[in-house]
């Protein structure tokens, strides 16, 4: 940690962007007061920055002024601003957690990581589902599964506040990250995608992606912001096993095929049934877990659970899905 609140041993942190996601970060950071000292909130719209007063923090109307008073920042601002604002933070020796996606291009993402690593600063991206207990448990179980296919659905009603990105960057990116980093831990060999424009002609509001991996296993990912329900589910089909998870309700069921030989009756070679196991998961807030990981990485040099390799893998596959949809980056 380059700069430190030496009196309290906490990370002095600010939030740059007080929109929908920014408000969530602000609230949770205020709850983690044993780890973070929420110094302030910056937003170019002055009235939005005033949310800081609710948490006894300072409203900043100048980003660089906030950088001078903090050890770290969270950047829940538009993707187009990520590179510029992150590099300004790195220049002031400030650690950064940035919202997904990391940047508009792979080249920008590389430049951002290089800048922070050169200065020995912590830098990570908010792929919050990686901290979901359903995903963490599936990640632990995945190496022992003879995988056939994975199906993931992330569906929501239309939100008029999301106007600058398509459904792949807005929603599907979370499940791309889960599939390539928590389940297969590899980049797919082939990527295909289809999409539908529902609420406008600029961005797809519904998309399906097919990721084909070495060995023949596949992942089917559906993302929708035109579904009149909120769905966050995952199904895994494997040889002798089936897993069904709900990332919203944080439940996971594992069903395994069980074969019994009947020694008493040689005419019956076996009977077959399913063993169903309801996995007991810890009820933890994934974003709180992620922010704790960020804070402990700064204070105690603990490993960031979203690594550079993983973030770049997700970004690469995101680009491939966008290209399959549009013939270009979306």
Language model regions located:
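NAD(P)-dinucleotide binding in Rossmann-like oxidoreductases
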Residues: 217-290, 307
